[in-house]
C-alpha cells in the first residue's frame, strides 16, 4: 500500500443523497474516500481537517455499474465510501450545508 501524506488526499468528496442526509441527524457523515485508505487513516483525516472527534468508521467498497454504450459495454469506476460517526459532544460538519430540518 502506498503512503498518503496529506489527509486531504484521503477524503475525496462528500456523498450527497437522501440516505446520507438522513444519517446526518444521527451524527454520521458519508464521504467518498481513496480506495487504498484504511479506517485509521480516514479517522485521522476527518479529525485533522474538520477538528471533530470520531467514534467509529465503517467502509464499503462499491462496484462500478456496467453501462451500455453504442460501441458495446463500459464500466463506471469502483468507489469506496466511508460512514464516519462523530461523538455526541462534537460539533457538526458544515460541509453538508448545515442542519437539515
Swiss-Prot record:
Gene3D superfamilies (UniProt xref): 3.30.70.330
Gene Ontology CC entries for this record: ribonucleoprotein complex; ribosome
Pfam families assigned: Ribosomal_L23
Organism domain of life: Bacteria
Range of residues in the leader sequence: none
UniProt GO molecular function: rRNA binding; structural constituent of ribosome
Assigned keywords, A-Z: Ribonucleoprotein, Ribosomal protein, RNA-binding, rRNA-binding
UniProt xrefs under SUPFAM superfamilies: Ribosomal proteins S24e, L23 and L15e
A single GO BP: translation
Described purpose of this protein according to its UniProt entry: One of the early assembly proteins it binds 23S rRNA. One of the proteins that surrounds the polypeptide exit tunnel on the outside of the ribosome. Forms the main docking site for trigger factor binding to the ribosome.
Record's subunit section: Part of the 50S ribosomal subunit. Contacts protein L29, and trigger factor when it is bound to the ribosome.
Family note: Belongs to the universal ribosomal protein uL23 family.
Stated name of the protein: Large ribosomal subunit protein uL23
Provenance organism: Rhodococcus opacus (strain B4)
Amino acid at each position: 500500500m502506498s503512503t498518503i501524506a496529506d489527509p486531504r488526499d484521503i477524503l475525496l468528496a462528500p456523498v450527497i443523497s437522501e440516505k446520507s442526509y438522513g444519517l446526518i441527524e444521527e451524527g454520521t457523515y458519508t464521504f467518498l474516500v481513496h480506495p487504498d485508505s484504511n479506517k485509521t487513516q480516514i479517522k485521522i483525516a476527518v479529525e485533522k481537517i474538520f477538528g471533530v472527534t470520531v467514534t467509529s468508521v465503517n467502509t464499503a467498497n462499491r462496484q462500478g455499474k456496467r453501462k451500455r454504450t453504442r460501441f458495446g459495454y463500459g464500466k463506471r469506476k469502483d468507489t469506496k465510501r466511508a460512514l464516519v460517526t462523530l461523538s455526541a459532544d462534537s460539533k457538526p460538519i458544515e460541509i453538508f450545508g448545515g442542519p437539515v430540518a
